[in-house]
Swiss-Prot record:
It comes from Mus musculus. The gene is Rcc1. Residues 1-36 are annotated as: Disordered. InterPro entries: Ran_GTPase-activating (IPR051553), RCC1/BLIP-II (IPR009091), Reg_chr_condens (IPR000408). RCC1 repeats lie at residues 34-84, 85-136, 138-189, 191-257, 258-311, 312-362, 363-416. Transmembrane segments: none annotated. This is Regulator of chromosome condensation. GO terms for biological process: cell division; chromosome segregation; G1/S transition of mitotic cell cycle; mitotic spindle organization; regulation of mitotic nuclear division; spindle assembly.
Length: 421
């Protein structure tokens, strides 16, 4: 009898508790189509994944060791890839732990290496020095660190970075993760937005300006403990629920279930579509995106500009214009409202790097524009492109482009052979 009593008292291990409630999460942002990974641009810290001898690529190059990849994301100086079987691979700068794996063997950060996670992952996101992974049952694992203007602020605990994945404690299952340079946004299946990381520019949407610098008197816990972005719903007692969220470097876009576009964070060049250039510390209902004929389906933000697309496959840009990053043609100036990029075919997705923009066309071609300095445009030259240029190269022949993602100095493409499409 006594052993039975002991057994009764024993509480189940923590990770076993939610099993009864486990759900398989889904969201339209989860990619399931497998492909090959191509990289281009600067790779001096291994972010191209091509080994120690390749520090630059002017045209897309095939990353070896990676097959059946369904998502390829460029962080600031690292790259994260998700395989069809739900495993995560990383390469690039690991100074702050953004790779989530041991890179003590010289050169091991320059080629793809597996991140040890027991769970099947369905989505990844990457910032300047952090990476997030969303599991099929809606849990989020995070590694690396967040920084502000004064340096490292920590990851989930003040001043502590993590070189390996740690679980983010949240009650609700998450369906999507998105990363800015130094903040993370998590969308739950209930339509709530949780944010954490640096809040200096308002990008968390829940920390007043007074406390945005290192959390004020409450300290960094205010920033690093994920909390919900609360926004009262007009005319009802409830709060606004969201269906999607996207990040720029220092700002966030969120689309409500009713289709309204909200934004918060840095808008010093009107990159949020706000009439003014002040930072927004609470979500703003962005009237510049109100148009009864359009629904907005995709956003991507660089350092000071935004590229977005509507449900008809048209691409638009707004924000800072230097170096041609808006793709609106020679001499274009700053835009405070979404402005049609007319020289593009129908697009299926858009993306931004720090000072560049991209669009993938419905028929699988990729177009690039903006700053040419880092060879991120795939033109083979370092000149800026003020209008979209179709990317070409040996590795793009007889292939269709599925997605594009861009970091500070490098760009990552997911492609597949034409015969398979």
């Amino acid at each position: 009898m006594p052993p039975k009593r002991i057994a009764k008292r024993r509480s189940p291990p923590e990770d076993a508790i939610p099993k009864s409630k486990k759900v398989k999460v889904s969201h339209r942002s989860h990619n399931t189509e497998p492909g090959l990974v191509l990289t281009l641009g600067q790779g001096d810290v291994g972010q191209l994944g091509l080994g120690e001898s390749v520090l630059e690529r002017k045209k897309p190059a095939l990353v070896p060791l990676l097959q059946d990849v369904v998502q390829a994301e460029a962080g600031g100086m690292h790259t994260v890839c998700l395989s069809q079987s739900g495993q995560v691979y990383s390469f690039g700068c690991n100074d702050e732990g953004a790779l989530g794996r041991d890179t003590s063997v010289e050169g091991s950060e320059m080629v793809p290496g597996k991140v040890e996670l027991q769970e099947k992952v369905v989505q990844v996101s990457a910032g300047d020095s952090h990476t997030a992974a969303l599991t099929e049952d809606g849990r989020v694992f995070l590694w690396g660190s967040f920084r502000d203007n004064n340096g490292v602020i920590g990851l989930l605990e003040p001043m502590k970075k993590s070189m390996v994945p740690v679980q983010v404690q949240l009650d609700a299952p998450v369906v999507k993760v998105a990363s800015g340079n130094d903040h993370l946004v998590m969308l739950t299946n209930d339509g709530d937005l949780y944010t954490l990381g640096c809040g200096e520019q308002g990008q968390l949407g829940r920390v007043p300006e007074l406390f945005a610098n290192r959390g004020g008197r409450q300290g960094l816990g205010r920033l690093l403990v994920p909390r919900c972005v609360l926004l009262k719903s007009r005319g009802t007692r409830g709060r606004v629920r969201f269906q999607d969220a996207f990040c720029g470097a220092y700002f966030t876009f969120a689309i409500s279930r009713e289709g309204h576009v909200y934004g918060f964070g840095l808008s010093n060049y009107h990159q949020l579509g706000t009439p003014g250039t002040g930072s927004c510390f609470i979500p703003q209902n962005l009237t510049s995106f109100k148009n009864s004929t359009k629904s907005w389906v995709g956003f991507s933000g660089g350092q000071h500009h935004t590229v977005c697309m509507d449900s008809e496959g048209k691409a638009y840009s707004l924000g800072r214009a230097e170096y041609g990053r808006l793709g609106l043609g020679e001499g274009a100036e700053e835009k405070s409202i979404p402005t049609l990029i007319s020289r593009l075919p129908v697009v299926s997705s858009v993306a931004c790097g720090a000072s560049v923009g991209y669009a993938v066309s419905k028929d699988g071609r990729v177009f690039a524009w903006g700053m040419g300095t880092n060879y991120q445009l795939g033109t083979g030259q370092d000149e800026d492109a003020w209008s979209p240029v179709e990317m070409t190269g040996k590795q793009l022949e007889n292939r269709v482009v599925l997605t594009v993602s861009s970091g500070g100095q490098h760009t990552v493409l997911l492609v597949k052979d034409q015969a398979q499409s």
